[in-house]
């Protein structure tokens, strides 16, 4: 499933995006952000993050640097720490 989503983004970036004017207000671009989000979080959460990002990409938003959020890691508590 992840491969399909990434493939669709690749097709967009390779064949559709070059035909349109560069209007993305963010770095990385919205399509690159969505691609990175899918790689990090999987197809469903990554696509959701991409949709949220694209919804902010309009003239009333200032744009700027907006990277994919880091994935939170769960730390295991070391039970031997106080011994």
Curated annotation (Swiss-Prot):
Tell me where in or outside the cell this protein is found: Cell membrane
Q: Does the keyword Membrane apply?
A: yes
Q: How does it sit in the membrane?
A: Peripheral membrane protein
Which coarse location class applies to the principal site listed for this UniProt protein?
A: membrane
Q: Which UniProt keywords apply?
A: Cell membrane, Membrane
Matching entries from SMART domains are given as: Haemolytic
Query: Can you list the disulfide-bonded cysteine pairs?
Result: none
Any one Pfam family match given in the protein's UniProt record, by short name: YidD
Q: Which family does it belong to?
A: Belongs to the UPF0161 family.
Q: Specify the protein name.
A: Putative membrane protein insertion efficiency factor
What organism does the record attribute this protein to?
Staphylococcus saprophyticus subsp. saprophyticus (strain ATCC 15305 / DSM 20229 / NCIMB 8711 / NCTC 7292 / S-41)
